[in-house]
A protein has these predicted regions:
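Flexible gly/pro-rich beta->alpha loop and the following alpha-helix that scaffold active-site loops
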Residues: 2-62, 68-75
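Conserved beta-strand segments of alpha/beta enzyme cores
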Residues: 6-8, 121, 138, 158, ...
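A glycine-centered loop/beta-turn motif at secondary-structure junctions
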Residues: 148-176
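A secondary-structure boundary/capping signal
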Residues: 63-65, 87, 126, 172
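Pocket-forming structural segment of enzyme catalytic cores
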Residues: 75-155
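Structural motif
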Residues: 28-30, 124, 169-171
Length: 176
């Protein structure tokens, strides 16, 4: 609301509308536990309608578990874990470790307007990282250390923020 948007809570498939802009101008998929979120999306018959809206161009942002749900491929997924997909990337669940391994770091994030004089501070809580991206996926931020998934031309370490068309995903929690 502070940014001028009018948030709408989505609890049921009827809250989604039939097309982008019908009821929603965009979607924020928060952090949480991705397998539980996947189970609930399936139980409440929201998985297919959300997939269709995303495929039709609904802008969406996913943080942490939201990143996992927006990925086309996941390493370490639970058996039967459903994804929304949409971003041509492979993510690794809980890549930075368990809850006790949560940490904070200043990122290399020129794609998010941050630079050496203005780093982007990020909080990682049981976070995924991006193992690889497909063509057309823009890498927006990396950690300062670690292997950048062998992606040529990528400075820094692990990939932690990407954009693919109208979809944006971060492995960190910007709200913290």
């Amino acid at each position: 609301e502070a940014a001028g948007a009018r948030p709408v809570v989505v609890r049921r498939a009827t809250d989604l509308g039939n097309a982008p802009g019908d009821r929603l101008d965009g979607l924020v998929i928060p952090g949480g536990e991705s397998t539980t979120m996947s189970t609930l999306l399936t139980s409440f018959d929201m998985l297919l309608p959300l997939r269709e809206l995303i495929a039709a161009g609904l802008p969406a942002y996913g943080s942490c578990a939201g990143m996992i749900l927006l990925a086309d491929r996941v390493e370490g997924a639970e058996e039967g874990q459903a994804l929304l997909g949409g971003i041509d990337m492979t993510v690794r669940r809980n890549a930075f470790g368990r809850q006790v391994d949560s940490y904070e770091e200043d990122l290399i994030a020129p794609g998010l307007g941050a630079g050496k004089d203005r780093p982007l501070h990020a909080v990682f809580i049981r976070a995924p990282w991006v193992e690889s991206v497909g063509p057309g996926v823009e890498i927006l931020a990396t950690t300062r250390t670690g292997r950048a998934a062998g992606v040529s031309g990528v400075d820094g370490g692990r990939i932690v923020a990407v954009r693919h068309g109208a979809l944006l995903a971060t492995s960190f929690h910007p709200e913290v």
